[in-house]
């Protein structure tokens, strides 16, 4: 049987002297718990949520409403019956061989061949368990319960240990992640400095090589320009010599020739390209993954 409930809050009514779950009657005979009546109390009256009939509550005193004693008595009976049923469930069972007896003993004989280890006094004296060592069923189950309680405590202890270890591991994971971030930042800073240094070194070598190449190109271009001008002057000299060569004998004899005027341009130095040894560079040694 179940304890009756308040139809408003769905909580069990109580048979205790005081408390919000005591059943009290309204004027219309409907029953509510004190807690719900307190919530419904307004302007010194309670309007029944079922029939809407108002009930006056003098001086807001809910205790002035009559308790539903018949319901309280019923609650006490139900509570007592429930306790008896619980105790009865734990009573020793009837003996299978002798149903008129209670099987209050458990056979603990090591060589017992009977499948049913529960026995009564008759089983011990005249039945299948005659002369067998026995133990009270309640004593045996108490030992079981103590062992079960021990296992429960051990499991709870293991749960606590698991929680401690889990927390330690979670903390280690967080610390490891933090350390990783620090290490990664340090590594990036290190290689950033290397890249900056390499970039600076690369720019310096390129600028130095470019400047030397520019100087060599300027030198060679100046000599090329000079030789082009010299070629043009020689072409004019050839034209002048051809003109003189084609003169009549008398004119050529009278004019004569001025050899220094022509051959002064022939004594030129040999122009060689500028030396490119200064463009040889020595790159910093670095071990690449391909072995180069």
Curated annotation (Swiss-Prot):
The lineage of its organism: Eukaryota, Metazoa, Ecdysozoa, Nematoda, Chromadorea. E3 ubiquitin-protein ligase which catalyzes 'Lys-48'-linked polyubiquitination of ced-1, promoting its proteasomal degradation to maintain appropriate ced-1 levels for apoptotic cell clearance. Acts together with E2 ubiquitin-conjugating enzyme ubc-21. It comes from Caenorhabditis elegans. Interacts with E2 ubiquitin-conjugating enzyme ubc-21. Interacts with ced-6; this mediates interaction of trim-21 with ced-1 and is required for ced-1 ubiquitination. Interacts with nck-1; the interaction is required for ced-1 ubiquitination. The coiled coil is required for interactions with ced-1, ced-6 and ubc-21. SUPFAM superfamilies: B-box zinc-binding domain, RING/U-box. CDD domains: Bbox2_TRIM23_C-IX_rpt2. One of its GO terms (molecular function) is zinc ion binding. Disruption phenotype: RNAi-mediated knockdown results in increased levels of ced-1. Its EC number is 2.3.2.27. Pathway: Protein modification; protein ubiquitination. It comes from the Eukaryota. PROSITE patterns: ZF_RING_1 (PS00518), ZF_RING_2 (PS50089). Residues 152-179 form a coiled coil. Gene3D superfamilies: Classic Zinc Finger, Zinc/RING finger domain, C3HC4 (zinc finger). Keywords: Coiled coil, Cytoplasm, Metal-binding, Transferase, Ubl conjugation pathway, Zinc, Zinc-finger. This is E3 ubiquitin-protein ligase trim-21. A zinc finger (RING-type) spans 6-52. The keyword Nucleotide-binding does not apply. It is found in: Cytoplasm. In early larva, observed mainly in pharyngeal and body wall muscle cells. InterPro entries: E3_ubiquitin-ligase_RING (IPR052667), Znf-RING_euk (IPR027370), Znf_B-box (IPR000315), Znf_RING (IPR001841), Znf_RING/FYVE/PHD (IPR013083), Znf_RING_CS (IPR017907). A zinc finger (B box-type) spans 90-137. Zn(2+) binds at residues 95, 98, 123, 129.
């Amino acid at each position: 049987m179940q304890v009756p409930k308040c139809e408003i809050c769905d909580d069990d009514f109580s048979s205790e002297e005081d408390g919000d779950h005591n059943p009290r009657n309204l004027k219309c005979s409907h029953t509510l718990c004190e807690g719900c009546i307190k919530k419904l109390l307004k302007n010194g009256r309670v309007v029944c949520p079922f029939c809407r009939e108002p009930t006056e509550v003098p001086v807001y005193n809910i205790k002035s409403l009559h308790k539903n004693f018949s319901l309280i008595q019923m609650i006490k009976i139900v509570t007592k019956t429930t306790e008896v049923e619980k105790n009865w469930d734990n009573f020793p069972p009837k003996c299978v061989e002798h149903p008129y007896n209670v099987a209050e003993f458990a056979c603990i004989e090591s060589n017992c061949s009977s499948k049913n280890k529960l026995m009564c006094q008759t089983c011990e004296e005249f039945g299948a368990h005659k002369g067998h060592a026995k133990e009270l069923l309640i004593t045996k189950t108490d030992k079981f319960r103590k062992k079960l309680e021990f296992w429960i405590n051990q499991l709870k202890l293991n749960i606590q240990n698991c929680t401690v270890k889990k927390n330690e591991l979670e903390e280690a994971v967080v610390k490891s992640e933090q350390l990783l971030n620090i290490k990664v930042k340090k590594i990036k800073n290190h290689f950033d400095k290397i890249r900056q240094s390499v970039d600076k070194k690369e720019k310096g070598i390129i600028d130095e090589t470019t400047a030397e190449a520019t100087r060599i190109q300027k030198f060679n271009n100046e000599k090329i320009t000079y030789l082009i001008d010299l070629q043009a002057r020689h072409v004019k000299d050839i034209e002048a010599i051809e003109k003189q060569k084609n003169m009549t004998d008398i004119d050529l004899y009278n004019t004569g020739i001025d050899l220094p005027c022509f051959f002064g341009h022939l004594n030129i130095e040999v122009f060689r390209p500028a030396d490119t040894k200064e463009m040889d560079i020595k790159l910093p040694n670095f071990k690449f993954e391909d072995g180069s």
